[in-house]
Amino acid sequence: MAGFIGKEQHSIDEKGRFMIPARFRKLLGDGKEARAKGAIFYVMKAFDGSLELYEPEIWAEKEKGLMSLSDFNPDERMLKTMMYERLDSVEMDRQGRIALPKDFLLHAAIVKDIVIIGANVKMILWSPEKLTSMIRESGTRFQVLAGRYF
């Protein structure tokens, strides 16, 4: 589905809103319909300090794994609790903006600007400073991983 590819930097307004890149909005439904209806996304706090934005169809596939976990197994129940604690739903307004909850902005250290990376079926949201730092610190690791998987 989706096919989000590319990277853009946008500003965050005083209400915690940012603009979904136009090229990504075009991939949502027929574009106009998604804006008129107010497209819903799921946003998750990632373990690396970024945020991940999923369309409902994509999140539903991921959620199947969570739903298969038992509430009677303490580890599985804890995992479900921790995953859902890191998740929220957000709606895109008619201007193509999404407002992120304050605790999500804090998690990702997003203040004035946001970097939106298209990662095929999801968008990864970073603070520009955190992204630059992560890339700088993992330069040789990237080479090793790319060599291993590509």
Curated annotation (Swiss-Prot):
It is found in: Cytoplasm, Nucleoid. The keyword Cytoplasm applies. Keywords: Cytoplasm, DNA-binding, Repeat, Transcription, Transcription regulation. GO terms for biological process: negative regulation of DNA-templated transcription initiation. The keyword Metal-binding does not apply. Transmembrane segments: none annotated. GO terms for molecular function: DNA-binding transcription factor activity; transcription cis-regulatory region binding. It comes from the Bacteria. Residues 7-58, 87-130 form the SpoVT-AbrB domain. Its main location: cytoplasm. GO terms for cellular component: cytoplasm; nucleoid. Belongs to the MraZ family. Forms oligomers. NCBIfam families: PRK00326.2-2 (NF001476). This is Transcriptional regulator MraZ. It comes from Chlorobium phaeobacteroides (strain BS1).
